[in-house]
Amino acid sequence: MVSRQEQFEQVQAVKKSINTASEEVKNQALLAMADHLVAATEEILAANALDMAAAKGKISDVMLDRLYLDADRIEAMARGIREVVALPDPIGEVLETSQLENGLVITKKRVAMGVIGIIYESRPNVTSDAAALTLKSGNAVVLRSGKDAYQTTHAIVTALKKGLETTTIHPNVIQLVEDTSRESSYAMMKAKGYLDLLIPRGGAGLINAVVENAIVPVIETGTGIVHVYVDKDADEDKALSIINNAKTSRPSVCNAMEVLLVHENKAASILPRLDQMLVAERKEAGLEPIQFRLDSKASQFVSGQAAETQDFDTEFLDYVLAVKVVSSLEEAVAHIESHSTHHSDAIVTENAEAAAYFTDQVDSAAVYVNASTRFTDGGQFGLGCEMGISTQKLHARGPMGLKELTSYKYVVAGDGQIRE
């Protein structure tokens, strides 16, 4: 096993091969990575079967689905890499140019970060997405996968590096930390001078540990306690469609709804319909029904478990939904501000003033009017695959695409000027 220190030194030694690579060279590398990923389908699926067998009974079915790969999912990962090829290269973009009175010409130019570290949990597609985005944005990458997905991740990284071996980009610009212990995560948090940026992708425990302990600069990809508020002026059919999509289309992802807020004027009519749609109809269709966590007012209209205080602060990532009835738009916004992780929140209303108030007052990375929160995604936003959803305000916010993985520098051109 190569030590972490050796890996940090290896990636530092070769980072210039990607930091200064042309767009053509980077695109050739990405295409080779995609081709070799598909070519290694058999090996990747064999590794994934080992991870699935080891994880069964230890993690939820929803989380097992995150971990699971088949040939179609691997092809989708390769397709995601190829989509990055089609995106404009951000490196070298001139952001601003100005000329001073003394004749100096100052150009603000986009540049690579250098080496980016990614700590993430059991999602194999993050491996290929992260590699594609970092390389296209001119960065080398150090990956640290969760132990539940390690065999799969190792097989994916092996395929990606074999692709790079056919190009002029050194394969060591992609590094996979072989040690999946907690100590390896902490080593990355302290790797100042080796990592220029650290991005955690996972649950609240992982993200909080990185934010609290890292001395390397961090972009926080926060958890998603996502709200949908059904206003008194909502179209109920529209609201039910949005709720169904936001909760059930893929409950294990960070942009899935976790909390439903309903105006008291709508509760008596919409909550029984919601119960029919999310419980009775799903049972009839052989699907897992939604389990409700209800406040005292909501429990008057629908059956379910009484909500505990912590239910409104929980990212369930499962077929569980906390429901609260509120007396006003202002109460809904106040609840969101008290419990939100500032990821994605939505209002369903036909009232333009209510929509404007909600979008002005709710301080989240993405705020929706009459649309599902499931759109908070790099691909859906036209950014290609994403590095994560930033819930902080410094440097990057919302879906992080190529530009969010870059910095800038000033190039100052003169003709012998000196400062008096």
Curated annotation (Swiss-Prot):
- Name a single GO cellular component: cytoplasm
Molecular function per GO: glutamate-5-semialdehyde dehydrogenase activity; NADP binding
Known catalytic reactions: L-glutamate 5-semialdehyde + phosphate + NADP(+) = L-glutamyl 5-phosphate + NADPH + H(+)
Q: Where in the cell is it found?
A: Cytoplasm
The record's annotation in Gene3D superfamilies points to: Aldehyde Dehydrogenase, Chain A, domain 1, Aldehyde Dehydrogenase, Chain A, domain 2
Q: In which pathway does it act?
A: Amino-acid biosynthesis; L-proline biosynthesis; L-glutamate 5-semialdehyde from L-glutamate: step 2/2
Indicate the family of this protein. Answer: Belongs to the gamma-glutamyl phosphate reductase family.
Q: What is this protein called?
A: Gamma-glutamyl phosphate reductase
